[in-house]
UniProtKB/Swiss-Prot annotation:
Binds 1 Ca(2+) ion. This is Basic phospholipase A2 PC14. PLA2 catalyzes the calcium-dependent hydrolysis of the 2-acyl groups in 3-sn-phosphoglycerides. Residues 1-21 form the signal peptide. Its cofactor is Ca(2+). GO terms for molecular function: calcium ion binding; calcium-dependent phospholipase A2 activity; phospholipid binding. Residues 22-27 form a propeptide. It is an enzyme of class 3 (hydrolase). Coiled coil: none annotated. It catalyses: a 1,2-diacyl-sn-glycero-3-phosphocholine + H2O = a 1-acyl-sn-glycero-3-phosphocholine + a fatty acid + H(+). It is found in: Secreted. It comes from the Eukaryota. Belongs to the phospholipase A2 family. Group I subfamily. D49 sub-subfamily. The lineage of its organism: Eukaryota, Metazoa, Chordata, Craniata, Vertebrata.
Length: 145
């Protein structure tokens, strides 16, 4: 085997090993991003919601810092209710329709409907309230008490 071929094979193996160390984004969260886009007509990038306030993004604690953050807290609570029903909200895929008035759920199973309703309500809530750049990537240990 030629040295160039070995180098190429090594590069492929290293990149595959690196990719396997990155956890995949749960499918529902990717779908939730599309529901948000439908509700707010694409006004804001989805990543704006990944680290906003005390509740938008992983985890959450303290008092929500504004109405948009309160939407995320309510969404977290809705997912907790879904889990109590035996659903897996971060993995549950559902069927929805993006109409002129925003997203609508049309899923068949109880878990799909419940999780879809959680996401649609949160997305509609996000679309109603302003985004405050000062509340993005905040120091949660100081501001979320």
């Amino acid at each position: 085997m030629y040295p160039a071929h070995l180098l190429l094979l090594l590069a492929v193996c290293v990149s595959l090993l690196g990719a396997s160390a990155i956890p995949p984004l749960p499918l529902n969260l990717a779908q939730f991003a599309l529901v948000i886009k439908c509700a707010d007509k694409g006004k804001r990038p989805r990543w704006h919601y990944m680290d906003y306030g005390c509740y938008c993004g992983p985890g959450g604690s303290g008092t929500p810092i504004d109405e948009l953050d309160r939407c995320c807290k309510t969404h977290d609570e809705c997912y907790a209710q879904a889990e109590k029903k035996g659903c897996y909200p971060k993995l549950t895929m559902y069927s929805y329709y993006c109409g002129g008035d925003g997203p609508y759920c049309n899923s068949k199973t109880e878990c799909q409907r419940f999780v879809c309703d959680c996401d649609v309500r949160a997305a509609d809530c996000f679309a109603r309230y302003p985004y405050n750049n000062k509340n993005y990537n905040i120091n949660t240990s100081k501001r979320c008490k």
